């Protein structure tokens, strides 16, 4: 196997190799992407959201842009509710990147723009789910991410 097993269910990805470069088919964007460790995590987490947590594919945005302190940044994944409001930001890291305070702070900075109620950080091995209360300026970590209808 090209990349290590993750702490997510295995999925039957469409992998290809062309000129020594591996690619993975992105089911949402309908195109082949260069297979990097971070992309491996992102594609697993997308499938986890769709198949396990019942998030509609049409309500997931991949690599959405945002402006933060006059700098153009990208969120890995954004989930929307059925009314088109952002409800979750997911920051994906390669399995070799430890989920640290710095990684969580990066996602929190992105959330200062989006103001979502769920903040998720994952490296495919460890997943941190935080429910944000913007009114109280606080958050609470959850062991498990609720199904889409309960977000």
Question: What are these model-derived regions, one by one?
Answer:
Residues 3-118, 125-151:
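A short, conserved, highly charged catalytic patch centered on acidic carboxylates
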């Amino acid at each position: 196997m090209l990349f290590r097993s993750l702490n997510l269910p295995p999925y039957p990805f469409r992998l290809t190799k062309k000129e020594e470069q591996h690619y993975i088919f992105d089911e949402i964007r309908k195109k082949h992407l260069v297979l990097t460790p971070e992309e491996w995590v992102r594609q697993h987490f997308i499938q986890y959201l769709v198949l396990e947590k019942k998030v509609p594919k049409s309500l997931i945005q991949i690599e959405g842009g945002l402006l933060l302190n006059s700098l153009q940044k990208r969120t890995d994944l954004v989930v929307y509710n059925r009314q088109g409001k952002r409800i979750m930001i997911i920051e994906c890291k390669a399995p070799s990147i430890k989920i640290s305070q710095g990684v969580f702070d990066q996602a929190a900075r992105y959330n200062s723009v989006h103001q979502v109620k769920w903040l998720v950080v994952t490296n495919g091995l460890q997943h941190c789910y935080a429910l944000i209360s913007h009114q109280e300026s606080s958050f609470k970590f959850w062991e498990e991410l609720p199904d889409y209808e309960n977000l």
